[in-house]
Every structure is written in C-alpha cells, then in structure tokens.
C-alpha cells in the first residue's frame, strides 16, 4: 500500500502549480475540471506522475493553521529525494526560500519550504539504505 494523493484546497491555482512544478519538474497535469463542492463552484487539478499526485482545488480562503501552534490539522508532508541539492537549487532559482532546515543527522538531510498556501513541505535525502540508520533520531 502507498499514499496515492493528497487533496489540497488552495487560494491561487497557478501560484500553487508554479511552486510544485519547481519541486517536481518531471510531474505533469494528469487531469483537471470543475465541480460544485457544497454549493461552491471550484476548479480542480491533478498534478503528478503515474504513481502519485497532488489534487489542487481553488476557491480556498482564510489562513492555514499556524505551524507554531498545536491546533488540529496538517503540520507538514514530506517527499524523499535522491538529489536534495538539486531540489534546493531549483526552488531557490524559482524564487522560493528555505523555511528552515531539519535536525542534524549523519544519515539524512532535510529542508522545509512553505508553498503559496502556507502548507509546509519537507524534502529529505537519506545517505543510508539501512532502516535502523534512516530511523535514527537523537
């Protein structure tokens, strides 16, 4: 079993797409359309590859939960990469700043970015294939 997709409500479809295209240049738009969701007409878009994707739904309003608080909701989601330096370079070149770096570990490096909707996304690169090292926490 694996996670197939995340469904995100966004404020601006194009700004969201721009951010994730910088992070995932090999992904593409798999499908898109319009639907009525509890009386609100909104556009949806699936962005990903053949195995996983993100769904964006526009007409989002309000603020995302503050990450410094303990409110119920998503804290962040993460993707594993084999080239963290390449990802960081693409994101910086596209105008996105690192929100913060992850904890120091001899077996992984990770950084966090905030997308245009204030979702926090972690990108992690492991330097070991051994589960006991990948799951080593100090």
Regions found by a protein language model. Name each.
Residues 35-36, 59-61, 83, 104-106:
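Short beta->alpha connector loops
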Residues 7-52:
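Core segments of cupin and vicinal oxygen chelate
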Residues 38, 63, 129-130:
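Flexible, glycine-rich phosphate/dinucleotide-binding loops
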Residues 49-53, 60-62, 84:
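Short, charged/polar surface micro-motifs in flexible loops or helix N-caps
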Residues 53-55, 120:
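Short hydrophobic-acidic sequence motifs that mark active-site Asp/Glu residues
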Residues 3-12, 30-33, 42-46, 65-138:
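Vicinal oxygen chelate
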Residues 56-58, 125:
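Residue-level recognition of conserved beta-strand positions in structured domain cores
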């Amino acid at each position: 079993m694996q996670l197939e997709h995340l469904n995100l409500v966004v404020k601006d479809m194009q700004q969201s797409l721009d951010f994730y295209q910088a992070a995932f240049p090999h992904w593409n738009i798999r499908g898109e359309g319009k639907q009525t969701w509890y009386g609100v007409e909104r556009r949806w878009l699936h962005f990903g590859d053949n195995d996983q994707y993100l769904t964006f739904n526009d007409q989002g309003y309000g603020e995302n939960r503050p990450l410094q608080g303990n409110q119920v909701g998503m804290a962040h989601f993460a993707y594993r990469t084999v080239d963290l330096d390449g990802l960081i370079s693409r994101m910086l070149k596209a105008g996105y700043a690192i929100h913060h770096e992850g904890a120091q570990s001899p077996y992984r490096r990770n950084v966090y970015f905030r997308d245009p909707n204030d979702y926090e996304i972690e990108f992690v690169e492991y330097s070991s294939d051994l589960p006991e090292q990948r799951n080593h926490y100090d």
